[in-house]
Amino acid sequence: MVLSLAGHASAKVIEKGAFHDEFSDRIGNFCDVSGLTVRADVTVDGSFAIRTHGADQLPYYQSHTSVRVVYTNVATNQYVTEVTRVMEKDLRVTDNGDGTLTILVLATGPSSVYDESGKAIARNPGQFRYEILLDNGGTPSDPSDDEFLKFLGVVKESTGRTDDFCAAVVPAIS
């Protein structure tokens, strides 16, 4: 009797790092409310890694991101704070054989909105899945030359509680 063990290709880290960004944006007719203008002050911090997986050694992306957005009504200076922690992870990467990759992504993590007193007024602790299409630049295993082509859509809607953001925020800042 001969026992044959086929080895699996091991994962290799292609790239990893951390990121930080801060910016502000002015949003008119916020939440489709005519005349409601808010300033959104955004802080983003996170880390990411790209690893190869499977027999084809295709790249899989994973990130952990914290986002803090303060929405301030420019007329009244009333504000709310949205705090989100997201883990995004490629669940499946498919080489379509035509120079493109289809990627199924899982996004999960809590998002909460707090009023000025610190009370939570809206939450979304769920997860959802979506697919994207990338041009692989002729090199399926090298993500450095990939280009985003298209958002293919939500595959699985958000699970769990999903409070209406605008229904909670507009009264709090008006």
Please describe what each predicted stretch is.
Residues 1-11:
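Secretory targeting and sorting signals
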Residues 11-174:
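Beta-strand-enriched cores of mature, soluble protein domains
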